[in-house]
């Protein structure tokens, strides 16, 4: 099972926003308490954060799907929904975030550096937030919006000061084990090193990190061997050390030919220039400071080979060190030479100041277009597609099972100028209009304008729409007032009729008189029965 993973494809999705609530305040002696529906909670974000406790992307290799929690639903009594919890994903220092197409989204360097990989969805407004002077008691609420979902690629580029490069079995792992406390796997066969190894070296007062990457072979820049896959771990290094094998067992190899092949592969390798760092430049690998370490001089033929090629290498301008990872010969001089390169690189980094761009406040343009209309054709019929962040978001927030919510959407689109734009594009009543790109969130409808050119609104009061007349008529406020007045008039007429009957003597007998009359009649009936019996 793999223990080191430096590239994964991660599927992240933010939490969905909670729906707004439709509720009316109910309290004793307050039959019309007004709307009190709360807003839905926002969905949680997915954030990548650099942590020194994380050294590999192995966890995301086994579990590549990560989803933040959703926002809670709004409730009555003005209670808002719970906010979705933010999902923090720890990543190693030096992680590069890319799209599947290779576009760099972020380069995460430094403890605590963050990047929002997927934002959570916005919670919907409750009917209390939608009320106004004209809309006192909305019978609808806005729906929550789904969170962002995307597939991102995480690539780990190890952060080291010095990189050891060379052919397989050149002794790179032995060197890093001899110079630091790192304990990489060491064996006497090629490609023993399958993952990058990091070690910390101290030379006097200078402390720096060296990286051991898998061996390079001819054609590594084209994907041969393992070197091309791990060369990105060398991109952040300030200097390189060529580790040359002076005791190779292959007859067609020697330190000079090995160096030429490695230099050619480094020159062919294209450094990722999409992130240029603070100074705005990325130095190619073959132009960075280099040292040459002639390794394995403790062998019988190694010392002779090192003395034979040393003059040639120094003539080319290289600083050459004869070292042995087994006997530790020459390692002290090599470590101090590395420290000099690291110190010089750090001094240059401190001299170069970051270009601080002062914040510029740009007010929103007054006449900025919030949408675009694209005429299309489908099945030889005209089609008009409305695109824009606002219209698409409004469609996602609309509950299409509620006629009043659809009317509210129509009002918003009309105020935004969508209807005027359709007129200008030549749209006619009955033409097909699509809001958004084709997909699950797109809305298709036959356009029936609520406003003709220069005419008044043809639609009724708030919440009504001519396109939904077949669904049933909803009484307007004026109709409700008329019905209420008719009921009051009917009650007044009934009272007047009762009053006229009372004045006519129909209702003059009181309750006590009726009781006395009934008691008298019952006594007379009883005496009549007694006389008949005698």
Curated annotation (Swiss-Prot):
One of its GO terms (molecular function) is GTPase activity. GO terms for biological process: ribosome biogenesis. Mg(2+) binds at residues 173, 193. Its cofactor is Mg(2+). Residues 464-504, 512-526 have a biased composition (Basic and acidic residues). Gene3D superfamilies: GTP-binding protein OBG, C-terminal domain (3.30.300.350), GTP1/OBG domain (2.70.210.12), P-loop containing nucleotide triphosphate hydrolases (3.40.50.300). Residues 160-343 form the OBG-type G domain. Residues 2-159 form the Obg domain. GO terms for cellular component: cytoplasm. InterPro entries: G_OBG (IPR031167), GTP-bd (IPR006073), GTP-bd_Obg/CgtA (IPR014100), GTP-bd_prot_GTP1/OBG_C_sf (IPR036346), GTP1-OBG_CS (IPR006074), GTP1_OBG_dom (IPR006169), GTP1_OBG_dom_sf (IPR036726), OBG_GTPase (IPR045086). Residues 63-82, 456-534 are annotated as: Disordered. The keyword Aminoacyl-tRNA synthetase does not apply. The keyword Hydrolase applies. Its main location: cytoplasm. Coiled coil: none annotated. Pfam families: DUF1967, GTP1_OBG, MMR_HSR1. It is an enzyme of class 3 (hydrolase). Keywords: Cytoplasm, GTP-binding, Hydrolase, Magnesium, Metal-binding, Nucleotide-binding. It is found in: Cytoplasm. Monomer. An essential GTPase which binds GTP, GDP and possibly (p)ppGpp with moderate affinity, with high nucleotide exchange rates and a fairly low GTP hydrolysis rate. Plays a role in control of the cell cycle, stress response, ribosome biogenesis and in those bacteria that undergo differentiation, in morphogenesis control. NCBIfam families: Obg_CgtA, Obg_CgtA_exten, PRK12296.1, PRK12297.1, PRK12299.1. This is GTPase Obg. The lineage of its organism: Bacteria, Bacillati, Actinomycetota, Actinomycetes, Micrococcales.
């Amino acid at each position: 099972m793999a223990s080191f993973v430096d590239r994964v494809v991660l599927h992240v999705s933010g939490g969905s926003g909670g729906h707004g609530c439709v509720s009316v305040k109910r309290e004793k002696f307050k039959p019309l308490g007004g709307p009190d529906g709360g807003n839905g909670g926002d969905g949680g974000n997915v954030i990548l954060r650099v942590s020194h406790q994380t050294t590999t992307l192995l966890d995301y290799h086994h579990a590549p799907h990560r989803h933040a929690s959703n926002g809670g639903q709004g409730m009555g009594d003005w209670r808002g929904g719970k906010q979705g919890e933010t999902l923090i994903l720890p990543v190693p220092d030096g992680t590069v975030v890319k799209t599947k197409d290779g576009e760099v989204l972020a380069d995460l360097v430094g403890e605590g550096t963050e990047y929002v990989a997927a934002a959570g969805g916005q919670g919907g407004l409750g009917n209390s937030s939608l009320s106004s002077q004209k809309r006192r008691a909305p019978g609808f609420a806005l729906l929550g919006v789904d969170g962002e979902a995307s597939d991102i690629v995480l690539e780990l580029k190890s952060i080291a000061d010095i990189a050891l490069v060379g052919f397989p079995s050149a002794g790179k792992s032995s060197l890093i084990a001899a110079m630091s406390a790192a304990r990489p796997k060491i064996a006497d066969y090629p490609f023993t090193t399958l993952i990058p190894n990091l070690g910390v070296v101290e030379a006097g007062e200078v402390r720096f990190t060296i990286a051991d990457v898998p061996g390079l072979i001819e054609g590594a820049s084209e994907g041969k061997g393992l070197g091309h896959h791990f060369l990105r771990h060398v991109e952040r290094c300030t200097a390189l050390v060529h580790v040359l094998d002076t005791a190779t067992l292959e007859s067609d190899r020697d330190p000079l030919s090995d160096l030429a092949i490695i230099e050619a592969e480094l020159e062919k390798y294209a450094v990722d220039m999409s992130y240029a760092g603070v100074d705005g430049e990325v130095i190619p690998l073959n132009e960075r400071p280099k040292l040459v370490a002639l390794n394995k001089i403790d062998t019988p033929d190694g010392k002779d080979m090192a003395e034979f090629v040393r003059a040639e290498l120094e003539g080319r301008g290289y600083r050459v060190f004869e070292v042995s990872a087994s006997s530790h010969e020459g390692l002290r001089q090599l470590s101090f030479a590395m420290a000099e390169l690291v110190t010089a690189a750090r001094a240059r980094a401190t001299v170069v100041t970051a270009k601080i761009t002062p914040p510029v406040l740009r007010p929103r343009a007054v006449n900025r277009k919030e949408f675009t209309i694209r005429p299309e054709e489908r099945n030889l019929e005209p089609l008009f597609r409305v695109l824009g962040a606002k219209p698409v978001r409004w469609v996602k927030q609309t509950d299409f099972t509620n006629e009043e919510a659809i009317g509210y959407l129509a009002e918003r689109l009309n105020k935004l100028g969508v209807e005027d734009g359709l007129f200008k594009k030549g749209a006619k009543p009955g033409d097909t209009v699509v809001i958004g790109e084709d997909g699950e969130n797109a809305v298709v409808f036959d356009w029936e304008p609520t406003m003709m050119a220069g005419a008044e609104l043809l639609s009724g009061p708030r919440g009504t729409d001519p396109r939904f007349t077949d669904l049933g008529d909803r009484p307007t406020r004026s109709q409700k007032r008329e019905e209420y007045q008719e009921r009051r008039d009917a009650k007044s007429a009934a009272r007047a009729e009762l009053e006229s009957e009372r004045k006519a003597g129909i209702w003059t007998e009181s309750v006590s008189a009726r009781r006395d009359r009934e008691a008298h009649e019952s006594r007379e009936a009883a005496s009549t029965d007694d006389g008949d019996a005698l």
